[in-house]
Amino acid sequence: MTEVDDGAELLFFDTFSHEDITDINLDLVQFPKPVFITQVRIIPLGARVQADFPGGVRLGATNPSKFDLEFFVNDLGMPGASAFENLGLLRYNQNDCIHLDCSREKIPTDGLVLRGWYSTITLAVYGILTNSVTQPIASPTLPCEPAGPEMCNLSTEAHNVLLQEEVLKDDWAEPIPTELLVPHKAVVVSDYEHDDIEYGLSREHQHYHQHVDEEQREMRRLRRSTHSTDRSPPPPPMRTHTHSESNEREYIRCSRDKGSRDWSRSPEYSSHRSRRKRSDRSRSDADEHKWPRTPPASIDSPIRPRSPDAMDYDDDDSRSHYKMQASRGYRHSSESLHRDRDDEERSGTPQEQFEPILSDDEIIGDDEEDEAEDVAAAAEYERELEFAAAVAPPAIDAFEPWQRPLLVYEGDLAAHLNKELETLRLLFKKLSLQTRCESVTAFSDEHGLSADEREQFVYLGEQLNNQLGYLSQHYKRRNFVLQQFFSHDDAHLRQAANVLQVALSFQAACMQPQPAFKIRHIKLGARMAELLGSNEQLFGHLLQEQDFDLFEAVLSLYKEPYMALSIKLQLLKAVYAMLDTRLGVQNFLSPKTNGYQMVMDFLKTAKLTRTKYALQAIIKKLHLYEALASVQQCCRQIFLDTDASVPETTPDPNRLDVCQKIEFAFQMLMDALTDSQLSYQQPRRFLPVSKKFEVLTDPTAQRSFGNALQSYFVQHSLAEALLVILSNPKEVPASTFLCTLDLMHTLLRSHVGIDYFVDDAFPVTQMIVSILLGLEEVPSQPRVVEAKPEGKEDKPMDDSVEQKPDEGKAAGIRAAEEPKMAPPPVVRKPILRPVLPRLARLGIELSYKVQTRYHLDAITFTAACPEYDTIKIATHMHSIYSQTCDPSGRQHTIEVLGLNNNLKIFMDLIKKEQRLQTQRQLLSSPGTKYKSPVLSYAVDMVDACVRYCEQLDYLIEHGGVILELAKNHETFEPSVSAVLQEMYVYMKPLEAINVFVYDDIMPLVEVIGRSLDYLTTFPGDLIMALRILRFLAISKPRQKSHGTEELKHRFVALQLYAADGVQLLLQIMERLCTHFEQPGIHAPALMTIQGVHCCQIMLPTLQILRELLSYAILCRDGTYKDLTAIDHLVKVYYLLYYYPSRCQAGAEVEQCKLEVVKSLLAYTQPHEQDAESLHKSLWTLMVREVLKNIDGPAHFIPGLKLLAELLPLPLPMPQPLCDQLKQQHKQRLIIERKLWSAHLHPQSGQIAKLVEALAPSSFPQLAELLQRVCMQLSDLAPNMTLLIAKTITELLCTEYQTSNCIPTTNLERLLRFSTRLCAFAPLKSSMLSILSGKFWELFQSLLALNEFNEVVTNCQEAVHRILDSFLDSGISLISHKSTAQPALNLSAALPPKELIPRIIDAVFSNLTSVEVTHGISILAVRNLVILTEHDFTFYHLAQLLKQKLTEFQAWMERVILHNETVEYHANIESLILLLRSLTQIEPPPPMCAMPNRTLKLGAMELAQLVEFQDIDMARPPVLARILRVLEKYKLLANEAALCDLKQLIVLHASRQEAMGSASMETPAVETENDGANPAASCSTSSSGGSLNVEPFLPQAEGIVTQYDARPIFTRYCATAENPQLTARYWLEPLPIELIEDMNEPLYERIACDLTDLANVCLNPDLATSGESKRTLNLSGSPQSNREMTPTAPCFRTRRVEVEPATGRPEKKMFLSSVRGRGFARPPPSRGDLFRSRPPNTSRPPSLHVDDFLALETCGAQPTGPTGYNKIPSMLRGSRVGRNRGSRISAAAAFRQKKMMRIGSPSSWTESGGGSYRSTSESHFGGSDSHYSSPHYSGRSRGRGLRSRPPYLR
């Protein structure tokens, strides 16, 4: 494809569409200024075009793939020409020729005509704007006022209202476009679709077609506009006959639908309809009159809730105006048009003398008077439009949790539930009239009532129970109706009490004449007590006014002899329901009733299991009530009863106990909501057993338990308790805070929690959201009531629609004022504190779900109103639709739609709209397809649920209806039909008979097998089939000890495993990995809907595979040896790693990664008994396969990240509150690490090779991740830390020796790599054990070098940092609570004592040999300061200073002289710190297991150090000189250094008092040390207390002993910053931007010749161009290079035409992969579920004929059973590209040998870990720097106190 000219710009980009291709089609493109056309490009079907504004992605829609296209232009250089000039002929072929070059002859033109056999065409026109024609072109007049005949009776004010109060915002102001007709086709055109406007207006205002003279005036106006270059459309045919309004409306609509695809798409006058955007699309409502929209960012972008339609880009969503500047971007059309118009007006050119492009039937007239009026009106009208566009809100009503306030819908419940209230009143009225139930006595009287009246009581009571049961299905509805019913009339309360007493009377039941009615009477009473007993008002009335105890009455019936089991269970259910209220629980637990003891007695005497189960549910419900009450009490005790202003230095034991109670209560509540939900219910016909095939759920029992939970939440103010805990995290332990977050997550996953937060605790919910998001205050906005517009985002649409045309001037004023308030405020609230990611995610989830409930409530109330307000419904549905445009908002919104049967709201709306359409068709013309925004939005939301909802409860409930809806898509208008056609592909698996039946899943497996062919085209049916299979095969996660285990899921897993399900799933994974081969280069594609589809396939596939593998390995234990899946799992992880961090499928990607890790951990299940089996264990083999797959630059970082995910995180862990849990966790943590170490030991060689290959890497992110993995490995056990230490030591020594003892860049990298590892306690202990020998000789020789180039300097700095860690006793495996001898602990934290003098000498020599201003000097002084911390090291340092006093004084003189003569430097502060450390003893830390320091230098010794012996005595003293320097540079000097210096001067001045003491004698020990550690001081004084005697240092213990004594737990704080206690620190690669904070060079520039590298690494016969195209998926099908089509798409996101027979897209991708698919064997029957293929088959798999021919061609001889042994690696790579699936189908189920790889790790070790940097840095995110400050700057290091939450995910 040739490029356009350098000066060419994009003049036009759009899509023309026609109904059919039975005739030649014509289209016209007009330009408002003369242009030279240089090139025309046709965009093939599915090709992506990216504009340079955000979200500007378009898809080509050209159809068919081949046709001839002619281009004609109006030559402005030949004004008298009678015909168009032929520009050229393009023989379009989407695989070859797609552009026409017109740059040879430049013809000035203002129009381009297309002529060809096509149905849809997407084209881009490039050219040059010009004014250089033979005659100047007249300036275009302003467009005429586009008022058609339907707008005649609209007043100016009402017209302004309709145009200004828009809901969809235009990003640029633009005049109303005028549609142009194709010359050969005459249709009726209107600038507005007024039939849609009148849909929202009342009938009495629709008088648009009554005056023929007004129509004629408009016709003349349209004709006159043809004089200008604006090219207004020709007039419609004159219609003088009368007609009805409905027929006129239909005629306009039908003609517009046909003609809209044929109108020309000029850049200025583009179509203003969008058939795809639900906010703009096909309105038959009052919001149709919108002007053209800004091309939104929602087209095939991350905010789209579903795949866009290709045919939808031919309207305003894809409108791309020609450019007025050199850049290749789109420009605001209003700016360009106004600038052009102004330029031409200033030029003053005469009237146009060239012939414009006119239609054949256009008539040119001139009425000068009317024309002047029209121009003025058009100018005024355009100004009004610009103002309306400026104030209009955005098209997508995005919900921003940080800016927008949460809303709650307060509808008129009394009106909404009036029908239920009237029904209840009617039933009680019947009871009072037809039965005499005033009292139990009267009813029980034998002669009081007739038999008919008694039976009538049963009939009417059962009807009442049915109505009450309907009310109880919704907690809010039940409470409101009963409260209104009992509050408004006390007679109702008395009557209900009487009826309930009669129903519960055993005597009254016995008075029933027939036995059946006796039973029905008792059941009626039990059911009525269950339904009415939960009302606290009625319960209190019975108890206080009538002294009637409901519990006593029900339990007395329970105690009656010979009571049937079913009635007993019904009575227990009534007792259960009556415990919903606080009054009921108090009465039940009162001494009078003593209900708890009574239930316990029943439990002891009960013989039937079902009775015991019902009784224990009552007990558990009471316990849950008590737990929630304790939460309220504990929060009051912590936050109200205590003085929070008093800081607590030590945790209060009482407070810890209180917080532990809160944790236990929250755990019980989460258990009740998830795992043990069934045990808290009273399900019907449920027999509790340990295992059962299927547990049938009881919706009534679930609703009853949900109502009880919500009632308990309200009674105990759960939201307030959550608020005070979340807002005061420092007042509670971190485990309590994290438990609170877990409870919030659990509540938001259930409809009970969402209903509670919205209906019962909304003000508190607002504050919780503010706390979670870190906002200073709750965004304020008045609550919305039904009579007012719902929120500021809804005001424009509501007002614009509800406004009537006759409201006059007030309407116009209100229209001008209110849009200014419509946009939400953009000022962000200040963030009080850094918000943790988990808190922010939780706040966003809560915001979206509460807001979704608000809109659902509004839709429900509005749809139920007598007046069906479509505008209001569409407004709220548009808001929900807007929420789905954001990935996180879409996820949370869809979750709410899938809960509690909320999708029924949209299904009912669709049914209602269908009925309305049928009525319209009966009244007007049958067969006409009407457009409705409500219907479009409802279908969109159902479609979003089908596409994105992972929970399938909605599908079980509405699947059949949705399938029928999708099948009948042709009955809807085109835009809705397009959505339903795509939805039909998703619903295809539901056509199988009983797809949700567990008995036989083979139809589902067949659907998945067939869908493999469309894996990368439109995989809707595959996604849905995998979701259904996951629903059948995987049970909900629950603890084994809870409830009944369902066997149906295991049964499905067995069926799938027997049907080669593992191979089928691996085939899916392989095809995806093959399609995204080298996934790093596919990052842009993974950002789009392709990535979403890939994750939607991958997630259920991985979950099902994990279930199958876990179950198979669990059953076969050590005999399972199949490693086939590991390769594919690792490749899938590599693909997932390269997803961009902010992609649409971010949450799903993280879930998929976790599933891969869990699947690999399933291989760790078998238990080996001996060492020999340990080396061949499945665990060890899994690790080997993972390590082998880290075999290339693209795999290094994701491979190490996967290894880090698999390994346990380093100790210590956060400490739990409970001591019992602490002991259990301690044993588990230790055993887990020992097992990992044992299974990794056989792979020690491979681990060492990996470290050797990657450690010298110049890529800092890779080195940093490898450091963390090495830390994880070394934390497991002593053998692993010795392995890592020896590997690094060998690397350092080998590198130094091979370079002839000259430091190299590679050595510098290795030393820098080792620096951080030596600061890790386990690795430090092993390094110290091997320090003696060549390792120390390396350090010594490096420090002795006097060449100070950059490499040597960096090496010496790294050595100093390593020695810093070695000498720091804070870095140690010893716990601060150790009870061992302090000197023994010290010996374990220091290098061997014989090396310490040599280390001191080497450091001091290096210090005196380097420049005093060098960084090495400060590091060396730092090490000398560390040596003063303990007596042993201090002694040897003092001895060295005594021996080398001259050198020390010379170095000191150089430091002082530099600061005196040159400039101030920090080295003088280092000198002061060293002198202070020598003369003063720091107070020991409060908790320390090391011996305290007792030795220091006195005044005489200090004088000997600082007084020069061989220098002129006339010079001032050293300390005075230093003081003078600090005073001179007071602004730069450190105040602490100045204070230390003054103390030194005072000490030096006191030397006269110590003249009598001996030289270098140590003074007495400080008193604080005496008190701190008397034992240490005594031992020092006993040894003489002198620097002449070396302190005692014992031999260090072994590494094994140190490991046993290391701390397992540490304390932490939820809000403190300690990243090492978070999982993110260990598992996320460090962002590349933070590397320089770790004293690492950001980049190393390493010379590399890519050509030479390619010649070395690649096969000379490799076709680089073809392989690159194949890898980049530039071909539509990877079948062969001959069929590669550079433009065909993969993962199509447009609308697909469904084949009637198969329901599949017409185009197929993998045609050649039908053979060798792996389904040759028939599936096993149900009776043979446990049959599987044996490990060794007698008939080996055959070699494919194509592969055999390929082997013969390259001269290889097939050997072995398959001939695969000799296949060259490059040929194997091409086989993968052919994608025949033979790698999977040829492998047996229990393959013993692993296939050879294209690349091996050995090929990468030679390069020394060269510079590799990923092509995409956006996915390198997520972790804090380890060295947020230099690790030697502070003293709190090592294994001290930690304060951070546990390993947060």
Swiss-Prot record:
Could you tell me where the Basic and acidic residues compositional bias lies? 206-219, 242-265, 281-291, 332-347, 785-818
What's a GO biological-process term for it? cell differentiation
Enumerate the transmembrane spans.
none
Pfam families, per this entry?
A: VIR_N
Report keywords, A-Z. Answer: Developmental protein, Differentiation, mRNA processing, mRNA splicing, Nucleus, Sexual differentiation
Q: Which GO-annotated molecular functions does the record name?
A: RNA binding
Task: Give the superkingdom in one word.
Answer: Eukaryota
The primary site where this protein sits is nucleus
Q: Which GO terms describe its cellular component?
A: nucleus; RNA N6-methyladenosine methyltransferase complex
Biased composition range(s): Polar residues: 1671-1684, 1800-1818
InterPro entries attached to this UniProt entry: VIR_N, Virilizer
* Positions with biased composition (Low complexity): 1732-1742
Its localization reads: Nucleus
Assembly mode: Component of the WMM complex, a N6-methyltransferase complex composed of a catalytic subcomplex, named MAC, and of an associated subcomplex, named MACOM. The MAC subcomplex is composed of Ime4/Mettl3 and Mettl14. The MACOM subcomplex is composed of fl(2)d, Flacc/Xio, Hakai, vir, and, in some cases of nito. Part of a complex containing fl(2)d, Sxl and vir.
Can you tell me which family this protein belongs to?
Belongs to the vir family.
The name of this protein is Protein virilizer
**What gene is behind this protein?**
vir
